[in-house]
From Swiss-Prot:
Protein's recorded name: Galactosylgalactosylxylosylprotein 3-beta-glucuronosyltransferase 2
Source organism (scientific name): Mus musculus
Residue spans crossing the bilayer: 3-23
GO-annotated molecular function: galactosylgalactosylxylosylprotein 3-beta-glucuronosyltransferase activity; metal ion binding
Catalytic activity line of the entry: 3-O-(beta-D-galactosyl-(1->3)-beta-D-galactosyl-(1->4)-beta-D-xylosyl)-L-seryl-[protein] + UDP-alpha-D-glucuronate = 3-O-(beta-D-GlcA-(1->3)-beta-D-Gal-(1->3)-beta-D-Gal-(1->4)-beta-D-Xyl)-L-seryl-[protein] + UDP + H(+)
Length: 324
């Protein structure tokens, strides 16, 4: 009985397989196209002899590549004019605090070079160490003010500003000057970052208002039809340029084209150094008003309160010498 069932099963098995294959084949499915180009090249092998697939081309990809090849290359952005900030400084209890505040501002300005000039015969360790950690392109200069000029009623920082001007001229003496702008940044001033955007486009000499100066909330150039026509100031309106040292910037090319333009000690009256300097390089008609036609204050002539050190010990000092 078992042998009869097995014989019948093996007789029917081939026919069952044929029926299954016929049902699985879809007569509407297109036959695969044969190509003479293999997907794998027998000669393209990688490490260990493994086959490396060749990249297949397609009309869409070829068209995209042609579009990319024909697309013009983007030109590099023009280099920003360098802003040179000349800062006179002198030793006092708040010196490092003032310089720290100023450095925190300058660090946020692109393409700025800080020229720091000390009023002393040698570089101080405090300022040298400070600049080494400041993270700013800088030049550290020093020149002492002669004793006879250290009077309360005489202008300050004349020698230091002139040292910064001399360094700029010497640096660009034997090379073509790159676009640049110079301004005088006292270490106790406060600056809005917007001011640096304004001054960077200076063509010759640009001007703007200054806050908290001259016994007023602000001083500014008076502008009409885009030209400076006068001065809003609390002291000597008859000055040719009744402006604070923090209220103007000069193109580097103008500085180099006028090598004799400096701040003068002799023949310059108190409070007239700005006017005497600007008279050597420009005229009022050529001034370029910034800060919305000189209607916005972007720099303040702030002054740090005099430090009270009455309780500082003279004999029983701290065992640790901390720099302040």
């Amino acid at each position: 009985m078992k042998s009869a069932l097995c014989s019948r099963f093996f007789i029917l098995l081939p026919w069952i397989l044929i029926v299954i294959i016929m049902l699985d084949v879809d007569p509407r499915r297109p036959a695969p196209q044969l190509t003479s180009r293999p997907y794998f090249s027998p000669h393209a092998v990688g490490c260990g002899g493994s086959r490396v697939p060749l990249r297949r081309s397609s009309p869409g990809r070829d068209a995209a590549e042609k579009r990319n090849e024909s697309r013009p290359q983007l030109q590099p952005e023009p280099r920003l004019p360098t802003i040179y900030a000349i800062t006179p400084t002198y030793s006092r209890p708040v010196q490092k605090a003032e310089l720290t505040r100023l450095a925190n501002t300058f660090r946020q300005v692109a393409q700025l070079h800080w020229i720091l000039v000390e009023d002393r015969a040698t570089r101080s360790e405090l300022v040298s160490s400070f600049l080494a950690r400041a993270g700013l392109p800088n030049t550290h200069l020093h020149v002492p003010t002669p004793r006879r000029y250290k009077r309360p009623w005489l202008p300050r920082a004349t020698e230091q500003r002139n040292a910064g001007l001399a360094w700029l001229r010497q640096r660009h003496q034997h090379q073509s000057a790159q676009p640049g702008v110079l301004f005088f940044a006292d270490d106790d001033n406060t600056y809005s970052l917007e001011l640096f955007q304004e001054m960077r486009t200076t063509r010759k000499v640009s001007v703007w208002p200054v806050g908290l100066v001259g016994g007023r909330r602000y001083e500014r150039p008076l502008v009409k039809n885009g030209k400076v026509v006068g001065w809003y100031t609390g002291w000597r309106e008859d000055r040719p340029f009744a402006i604070d040292m923090a209220g103007f910037a000069v193109s580097l090319q103008v500085i180099l084209s006028n090598p004799k333009a400096v701040f003068k000690r002799r023949g310059s009256q108190p409070g007239m150094q700005e006017s005497d300097f600007l008279k050597q390089i420009t005229t009022v008609e050529e001034l370029e008003p910034k800060a919305s036609n000189c209607t916005k204050v972007l720099v303040w002539h702030t002054r740090t309160e005099k430090v009270n050190l009455a309780n500082e010990p003279k004999y029983h000092l701290d065992t640790v010498n901390i720099e302040v």
